[in-house]
Amino acid sequence: ISFLALTFFVLAGAIYRFRKRMLHTSLWCLLMLTVGYTTYAVILIRANANTPLNENAPDNIFTLKSYLNREQYESAPLLYGKTYASEPEYVPEGDYYRVKTTKGSAVYRPDKEKGKYKIIRYKEDVCYTQNMLFPRMWNERMAASYKNWTGGSEAAPTQKENLTYFITYQLNYMYWRYFLWNFVGRQNDVQGHGGPEYGNWITGISWLDNVRLGDQKLLPESLRQNKGHNVFYGLPLILGLIGIYWQLVRGKRGKQQFSIVFFLFFMTGLAIVLYLNQTPGQPRERDYAYAGSFYAFAIWIGMGAAGLCDTLRKKKNSVLPISVSMLLCLLIPVQMVL
């Protein structure tokens, strides 16, 4: 706490002392980042209070690292690694064979008598055969579920099936579906697992929704009147796309601004999809994990409204068109609230 307080005051003093624009902005960003990281102090404080529910007991820096890395769960490969059909690699050892492993990171525990941390063991990472580039279908317990999304057999996955799963499930179902919930419309708040009746995105345009999901009027009354049912007719999405276009056509400065917003959009959305490497049958909807990218797209929605007004302002006799465009832009958030 003393270190964080000192860091805060040093950064605040530096911001006051140095008035250069770039340095000033950089220091403010660093200060806000530091303030954000202070929220993790709550985890340490709570763990040291020894509460009845204290998963992983993150009461020191090493157990906190394990807690934040979610090491209680099986780690998913990212760029290269096993598939669900991979087998452990064996090496001879005397008269027997043992599983081949590599030395992993050290596991530390506090030594209260000596007042320091000591290494109690090293983690062992199992080596597998039949590895694959960019492995998306990696969990052996989910072989049947993977095949439900790719339409293949339960044999070793091909790279085509691997990419099919990545696009259809991880990208489309576990990201773009959530994205479209927020900017096009949502069928209901019942968790979906790929079927046509639960948790899909909809537009509110009957013929289009019926082509994708079947006749929505045939759904039970409980689903048609579900409180999570919202239709925006794709208006926020259209306005956001207009905002992207408006930024890109505004020359070098506009492209620079677009790159900043896009970086925020990508790193808080699609990059998380790549990192999590999720398996089918998640216990709950995961839309909350991508909230940052939805905020970023909301910036483009605001840009779209500004772009429409700016375009119409340059035209002669533009009072009426500007008034109409402003009214339409205001109707979009009103529709989202209703």
Task: Annotate each language-model stretch with its function.
Residues 12-21, 250-252, 298-321:
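Membrane-interface junctions at the ends of membrane-embedded or membrane-associated helices
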Residues 22-29, 251-265, 318-325:
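Membrane-interfacial loop-to-transmembrane alpha-helix junctions, especially the N-terminal start
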Residues 245-250, 266-284, 336-337:
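Transmembrane-helix signature of polytopic, lipid-linked glycan biosynthesis machinery
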Residues 34-44, 304, 321-338:
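Transmembrane alpha-helical segments
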Residues 47-244:
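Lumenal/periplasmic acceptor-binding loop at the mouth of the active site in multi-pass
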Residues 5-16, 233-253, 307:
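Hydrophobic, aromatic-rich transmembrane alpha-helices
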Residues 1, 46-50, 226-229, 254-257, ...:
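Membrane-interface catalytic loops of GT-C/OST-like multi-pass glycosylation enzymes that act
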Residues 282-306:
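Hydrophobic/aromatic-rich transmembrane helices and adjacent perimembrane loops
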